[in-house]
Each structure stands twice: as structure tokens, then as C-alpha cells.
Amino acid sequence: MSEAGLTPEEIAALFTRADGSFAFARWGRPIAPIVFGVEDETLAVVKGALEAVVALAGHQMAETDPELGANLMLFFCRDWSELSDVPDLDRLLPDLAGLVARLKAGQANQYRIFRFDPAGGIRAAFVFLRMDRHMQAAPADVLALRQIVQVILLWSEAAFRERAPLAVQDGRTVLRPEIAGLIRAAYDPVLPVAAADAAHALRLYARMQAAR
């Protein structure tokens, strides 16, 4: 499928929540990442994936965020209980104990939390990954790319439930071209950092068409 393969309706669906509301947001500031719970080799893979997706979007990275220090935090663990031992995490997430309990009860293996600035742009994101057998079965580069794609924009909960954002091309795992095109369009500076009107899907579609 080409970048033009997404219709306005398909684009809108990627940002439509379970309650029917439309919610689009991109990062409103440079991304300053920090990764917990991985070896240096995996850390390099995660940062490489982030650099690639940020470059695709035409966005920026930073060593630190002046307000938060790090504004994209990725936590890799084998058991959700490990989150309770992360220093000061309960200050960033006041309901940490409740979150850990819910993740355990739901047997989840991943969870994402976003925070937003006054303009509605993404201000911070927290990514939690429990490395169960399904997660461990994925190569590190595939796992990293998939997670970064899912925090570069505020997608709907079901955006990639039926079809992953990645595809295999010439033996390599790559971002599906139509998703890459959508990410580029989403970061076009003429578009707002956030939108709650489904008509924004038409603007994204127009930018994708203009880039062909």
C-alpha cells in the first residue's frame, strides 16, 4: 500500500476513541528520552528507533526537558511490581500503586500514559512494558520501533489492533509506508499540534496527498 492508501475515513479511525470522540495530538516540544531496565545494547536500539521516527516526523530531540528533565520515559520490567521500586516514580504518577494493581489484574504486557500542554500537544509520555513471552519473542529492533511509533502521536486505543504499524520489506521490518506518510503529515508545521474535530483527518489526508 502506498502513502496515498489511507482514506480520510481510515485516518479518522486511527484517532477515534472507544467513546466515539476524535483526539489527535503530536509532541509540542523536543523529545528528551530516558529508558529504564535494559542493557546498553538494547538501549542503543531503542534510541536508534526513536531517532529514526523523530527524523521521519521532522521533529526534534533534546538531552533534557527544561521542565521535566526527561519527558519520554520507557520502563522495561519482568513483573509489574518492579515499578513500585523505581525511585520517585510515585511522584510522577500519584496513583502508581493503583496502576500496578490494575496492570496485574488485567495481565497487561504494555501500557502508555500521555500528558499534555495547554495547547493540547503531547508534553510527556510514559511507556511501561512487561517482558512476557510474547514481548521477548519480538526482536529488539522490532519491539523498539513499534513502541516509538505508538508514542510519536496520540493514536486511538484500537489504532493498530487489527493491523500493526510495521511490515516486512526485503527481509527487514519497516514502518508501513502509509503510516510513515501520516506521521510526516501530522508534524507539518501548518497543522495544529492537537485537534478534537474529525475534520482534522481531511487536513492530514490533504497533506499526505500534497507530499506525493
Task: Please tell me what each predicted stretch does.
Residues 18, 78, 114-117, 190, ...:
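Generic signature of intrinsically disordered, low-complexity segments enriched in small/polar residues
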Residues 8, 33, 94, 165, ...:
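Proline-rich intrinsically disordered, low-complexity coils
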Residues 120, 124-212:
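Glycine-rich, aromatic-bearing surface loops/beta-hairpins
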Residues 48-57, 82-96, 180-194:
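Short, Lys/Arg-enriched charge-dense amphipathic segments
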Residues 41-46, 60-146:
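Long, folded non-catalytic interaction modules
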Residues 1-74, 78-82:
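Long alpha-helical, hydrophobic tracts
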Residues 1-9, 94-102, 208-212:
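Short N-terminal segments
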